[in-house]
Amino acid sequence: MSAKISLVSFFSLVPFAPACPLQGGRAFAVKIAMPEIYVSTDVEADGPIPGPHSMLSLASAAYLPNKTLVSTFAANLETLPGASGHPETMAWWQTQAEAWDACRKELLSPHVAMKNYLAWLKRLPGRPVFVAYPAAYDFMFVYWYLIRFTGESPFSHSALDIKTYAMALLRKEYREATKDNMPKRWFDQLPHTHLALDDAIEQGALFCNMLAENVGMKCE
């Protein structure tokens, strides 16, 4: 498991709310909303659903809206007791030897991995928003594991799907909002390797570029 915090100062990310004086000598604190942190997440699994099958690897890359990479998290997980790999998924893994070897090293129990992940999410200097491509698959595993092993989800029940966001920006039907139909300017020169952390970083940068274009913001 690894959790990396960048050298970006916490206090440069979160606005300071000083006490404001009132007549009579009392003061009150100004409440300022925490910024959103976009937690681009990728999982690798040995089947289509959690429970009968297991999440093998979990990685997240936490981005500010301006594409500043604040922190990363990665963990490889032991398989669930009584679970087994789905035949079709395991056949696919046979074509991905390097990625399979990478996600079977330094294994943590699901309980330890998810406790560590929850603590990492709570240390982020903002409100975490789950982001993935496709969100339905990755969020299904992460939410199930968070509730099963920690009893809570900092993401609540919500996730942001990059493909759906692209559908809106491109004004295309959902099935046409594929990466092949996305403009090249949205893509940074980052690898997509089926190593969970690489993929989380790559798709997080993609989302931030889309966000910047949508709201007219400059990325780092």
What is the predicted role of each segment?
Residues 2, 6-12:
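Serine residues within intrinsically disordered or low-complexity segments
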Residues 10-11, 16, 28:
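Aromatic (phenylalanine/tyrosine) cluster motif
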Residues 35, 52-55, 139-154, 167-172:
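Catalytic phosphate/metal-binding cores of nucleic-acid and nucleotide-processing enzymes, i.e., regions
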Residues 35-39, 44-133:
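Conserved non-catalytic scaffold segment of RNase H-like nuclease domains
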Residues 79-82, 90, 94, 162-201:
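Active-site-proximal helix-loop-helix substrate-binding element of RNase H-like nuclease domains
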Residues 129-135, 140-141, 178-220:
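Acidic, Mg2+-coordinating catalytic module of metal-dependent nucleases/exonucleases
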